[in-house]
Amino acid sequence: MKKYILALLICCFSLSAFTQNVNLSNSPYWDGECYLAVNPKNPMHMVSAWMYFSTSNLKNSMATRTSFDGGKTWSALQQLPHLYSTFTSADPTMYFGKDSCVYLAYIDLSGLKSSDSGYIMVTRSVNGGVTWKTPVKAISYKAQPNLPIDRPWIAADASNGPYSGRVYLTSQNAYFTPQPHYPWITYSSDSGATWSPIKRLDDSIPSGTITDATAFTTISANGTLYAAYVSYYTKYSLYPRLVIIKSSNGGNTFTPYIAITYGSSDAMPVADSLTKAGLCIASNPADTTNLVIVTTTNHFGEPDILTYNSHNAGKTWSGPVRVNDDQMGANDTIHDLSWGSFAPNGTYAVTWRDRRNTGKSDTVPFQIYAAISKDGGNTYSSNFLISDAISPAVTIVHGDDFLGCGLSDSAVYSLWSDMRTGKENTFFNATSISKIITAVPIITDNQSVKVDFYPNPFHDQTNIMIHTSLPMQNTTMQVYSMDGKKVDELPIGEGVMHTITINSLARGTYIWSLVQGEKTLARGKWVIE
């Protein structure tokens, strides 16, 4: 006899992701703002980095751990040294270069709001991130006025082109310094040992009055460098725009394109001051003409995860495409903190911070969700859950702005920080892509009702999330075999979240219907493995 256990979870609940979340930092202190780099030549090999509170000097340092088996096991934690014992570190960024050499850049400075001294440091590892070379100064706080050492991004040319092995580093002026602020770039042709003088990326289309002039970077498989920054320069446009800078000659000259012209509908609500709306640009290793940008804007009436894509090497862009598939305009449901990446075969994934199940505003708890695209960012899969616990809100206004996303051809890798332990710690998850692409879409017959199942397919347990403002009295979940026989009928009570555990049921596909009285509200399929 089949046995179902139906539990209503009201205030505090957890979900089962496809694989268990792994706490990489395991710290009783604050650990946040992480980055994940996956080796494109061996996607089972990845390196994680994050800001780690060090008890040796009571400052933040850079911490790294490495996995060579797809995240099943990790090396011991490594801490990068400071220039001086009084310094603190922030803003990790990594990139795999030629011969699987991995580069790590970060800020090391006298204080997070200090104008005293600081540098963007670069180190590299020739053994996959197990150990690191002595970090070198790439950009000095004195290289240009107003501290041009904020929010670095690093990228390395791993192609077989004429600039193979060149490493690029971008930065911006510190947000708290006087305007103007610019995106800056430098490069190294000797594996990061020495660096060229920094120069402005925005010499053709100025960043204007933008405070955060960050230049996000990627390099295509043919060695073309792309950088994306926001410009609000009213002499050229009355609207803010996202500028894409392209260089095919090693960063010597740049060609600008406009990817996004932002309108008033894109502006983030003033009340949502904790929303992290940074962006990411990624190039498709299987198609050098395909790039995808992911960001957060208010375009569809609330902060959503949106992507824009190019299929002609950055010349023109399509979008926005809404990635999160919860109900549109659902009362200030805020999704943010996104990152995207490609697998070697061209599959694209986005990971983000999601609040569809936890309430309104940017101060409510959150979960981590993801979605994949098999067509270069034109369309996306159903969203799937990454985190297996709900985290209390992170209330840091400045900083803690990014998480990590990487892929192999068979798995999505996610790295993020949350507060489930009471202190912000850094977590990792690997989710099999086969579990995602075989999931069956849900048909909604009543537009005021949305039903999600995670995971699906599943083995012995799945989670039902019912999003609706309708009362759920006299509602049941009717389950049918594929030959049309009703095999069970489960009562559904009030509340968003329900968990079903199946002790005995044959593998196969089953049809379910959410029924209220004589009306079918939603229907779909379960795949039991």
Language model regions located:
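C-terminal outer-membrane/trafficking sorting elements
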Residues: 4-6, 444-454, 458-529
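Short glycine/proline-enriched turn or capping motifs at secondary-structure junctions
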Residues: 3, 419-427, 517-521
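Compositionally biased non-globular segments, especially hydrophobic aliphatic-rich helices
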Residues: 10, 86-88, 354, 465, ...
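Extracellular, repeat-based ectodomains that mediate carbohydrate processing or recognition
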Residues: 19-437
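Small side chains
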Residues: 14, 217, 227-228, 340, ...
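Bacterial Sec-dependent N-terminal signal peptides
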Residues: 1-20, 440
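Short, solvent-exposed secondary-structure boundary motifs
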Residues: 27, 439-446
